[in-house]
């Protein structure tokens, strides 16, 4: 048999109507209530101190790493798709909303035929962008994607960067992309120091040749 313990032995349950009214007044009229009213009136009477904006006429500027609707990136130099069809984004998706269909081309390399995301089911956790080895899928800043239907699918042509807009594609854009200082966080290998020594010797030889002339 379970043992039950009283949390507050001094607390008495109100019986009469007056006891119930007095208990309600004691709980509602406290110092914290007046503190909240004071803060509200102080912010209300301040000039040019609006805590809201007139949406959709005004919009808040979002950070580049904000997780909104996905984007599929291209290589700027070759205009090819970055996606290699490894399927890691589909496997790691905890909402099970990513579907990918791949096939082999004439060179025996895998290519993505169909790619779809159920945006109505996606929770925008960013796992797909974090796990992508080629930085092919990132999160953009397009957040106005409300729809009337529950299942709202986006397809490959919706996410992929158009070739005519490729010049506007920024490398470090969207959640999942590398940071601008990513190279500073990579551990140096022995080959790195060998290359730096060779460059230093080349610069030294160039300076000596310039002085001899």
Curated annotation (Swiss-Prot):
The keyword Nucleus does not apply. Binds 2 [4Fe-4S] clusters per subunit. Its cofactor is [4Fe-4S] cluster. It is an enzyme of class 7 (translocase). It comes from Campylobacter jejuni subsp. jejuni serotype O:2 (strain ATCC 700819 / NCTC 11168). This is NADH-quinone oxidoreductase subunit I. PROSITE patterns: 4FE4S_FER_1 (PS00198), 4FE4S_FER_2 (PS51379). HAMAP family: NDH1_NuoI. NDH-1 shuttles electrons from NADH, via FMN and iron-sulfur (Fe-S) centers, to quinones in the respiratory chain. The immediate electron acceptor for the enzyme in this species is believed to be ubiquinone. Couples the redox reaction to proton translocation (for every two electrons transferred, four hydrogen ions are translocated across the cytoplasmic membrane), and thus conserves the redox energy in a proton gradient. [4Fe-4S] cluster 1 binds at residues 83, 86, 89, 132. It is found in: Cell inner membrane. Keywords: 4Fe-4S, Cell inner membrane, Cell membrane, Iron, Iron-sulfur, Membrane, Metal-binding, NAD, Quinone, Repeat, Translocase, Ubiquinone. Its EC number is 7.1.1.-. One of its GO terms (cellular component) is plasma membrane. It is a peripheral membrane protein. NDH-1 is composed of 14 different subunits. Subunits NuoA, H, J, K, L, M, N constitute the membrane sector of the complex. GO terms for biological process: aerobic respiration.
